[in-house]
């Protein structure tokens, strides 16, 4: 779907953005419906993780100014006209000149469920040596109706700088692959998206990217839900950090600020009408299976996935005597990383937990 659209000055078409394969593009669509891509790699405004975003503006003569990003730099102001693309700011040069960033590569693999093509990215530690063995970290995106992509991510680079190979996939339900792919989780979430993530892990193991004995996992929001689901389904990970999760669709639906969005979209009916299905799709239903040492993290002002969701997992693991700790971040909303000090705190706690439970 398109977004951020503006009429051209002659009213003969619109400029808009859309996502394709984890890349946000700027396009022009005329009144006959013919479209043309004008720029790519829009974004870089999401400080923490490699989500889409960014903005653009079009002058009367069709010159476009937009925020451009890549794996290697946050957003920079860039101008494009019919002849050339020019980057006109270098805001990050001073910051990055003394930093060595990890290389990022795109990977594609097949889903074991239905043979669909699944896209992901792998970030390597700086000065990566393929002859060495590195811990392998899965980072699950939120949404789930969103996408990761070929964009700068401070969190990914911090994990890579700490010596981790970081894998971040776009399983089914992600945007930028068409309507049908995005709707595969309708009344079925979480489900085969879990298999898509694990298939990516196995792809990386088969291709010598990951060591099957050095696996770790984290993710926030819907990514926290996926992380909790993964450790409830298998014991392959050395340790996990579940950030601002949905743990219980019944309590989440009835306590979150967006309580009105779930009936007939995520699951069918209201919780009191479809109690068993709400429970069956809740990661808390799997807490009896979890053997993985797990840190749970949440912002204390989070209205989207309230602290009570995180505490359900924490208390369940405490009752089962599984190694766990609860990190509550004061004054933090659902967007924990919006405050840079919280971003650093988040990453530092995650790395400390993995170090404690290698």
Predicted regions and their residues:
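Cap/lid segment of the alpha/beta-hydrolase catalytic domain
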Residues: 83, 91-213, 220, 254-261
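Hydrophobic beta-strand positions in blades of beta-propellers and related beta-sheet-rich domains
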Residues: 5, 26-28, 56, 77, ...
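Active-site-proximal cap/loop segments of hydrolase catalytic domains
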Residues: 168-358
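Conserved beta-propeller blade repeats
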Residues: 1-17, 43-67, 97-106, 155-157, ...
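Beta-propeller fold detector
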Residues: 36-42, 85-92
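A flexible loop/linker signature enriched in serine peptidases of the S9 family
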Residues: 1-2, 17-27, 44-49, 68-76, ...
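Short loop/turn segments that connect beta-strands within beta-propeller blades
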Residues: 29-34, 81-83
């Amino acid at each position: 779907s398109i977004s951020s659209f503006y009429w051209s000055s002659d009213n003969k078409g619109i400029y808009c953005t859309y996502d394709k394969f984890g890349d946000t593009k700027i396009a022009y669509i005329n009144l006959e419906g013919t479209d043309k891509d004008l720029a790519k790699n829009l974004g870089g405004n999401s400080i923490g993780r490699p989500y889409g975003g960014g903005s653009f503006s079009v002058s009367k003569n069709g010159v476009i100014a937009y925020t451009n990003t890549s794996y290697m730099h946050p957003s920079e102001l860039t101008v494009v006209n019919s002849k050339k693309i020019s980057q006109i700011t270098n805001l990050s040069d001073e910051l990055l000149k003394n930093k060595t960033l990890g290389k990022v590569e795109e990977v594609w693999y097949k889903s074991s469920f239905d043979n669909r093509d699944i896209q992901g990215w792998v970030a390597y530690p700086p000065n990566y040596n393929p002859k060495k063995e590195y811990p392998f970290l899965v980072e699950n995106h939120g949404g789930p109706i969103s996408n990761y992509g070929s964009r700068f991510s401070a969190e990914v680079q911090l994990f890579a700088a700490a010596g981790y190979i970081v894998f971040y996939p776009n399983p089914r339900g992600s945007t930028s692959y068409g309507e049908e792919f995005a709707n595969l989780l309708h009344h079925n979430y979480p489900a085969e998206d879990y298999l898509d993530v694990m298939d990516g892990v196995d792809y990386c193991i088969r291709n010598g990217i990951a060591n099957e004995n050095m696996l770790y996992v984290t993710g926030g929001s819907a990514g926290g839900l996926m992380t909790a689901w993964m450790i409830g389904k298998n014991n392959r990970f050395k340790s996990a950090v579940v950030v601002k999760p949905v743990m219980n669709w019944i309590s989440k639906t009835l306590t979150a600020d967006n309580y009105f969005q779930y009936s007939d979209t995520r699951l069918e009916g209201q919780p009191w009408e479809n109690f068993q299905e709400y429970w069956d799709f809740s990661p808390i239903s799997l807490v009896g299976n979890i053997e993985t040492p797990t840190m749970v993290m949440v912002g204390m002002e989070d209205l989207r996935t309230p602290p009570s969701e995180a505490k359900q997992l924490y208390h369940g693991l405490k009752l089962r005597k599984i190694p766990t700790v609860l990190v509550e971040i004061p004054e933090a909303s659902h967007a924990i990383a919006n405050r840079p000090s919280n971003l650093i705190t988040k990453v530092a706690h995650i790395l400390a937990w993995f170090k404690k439970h290698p």
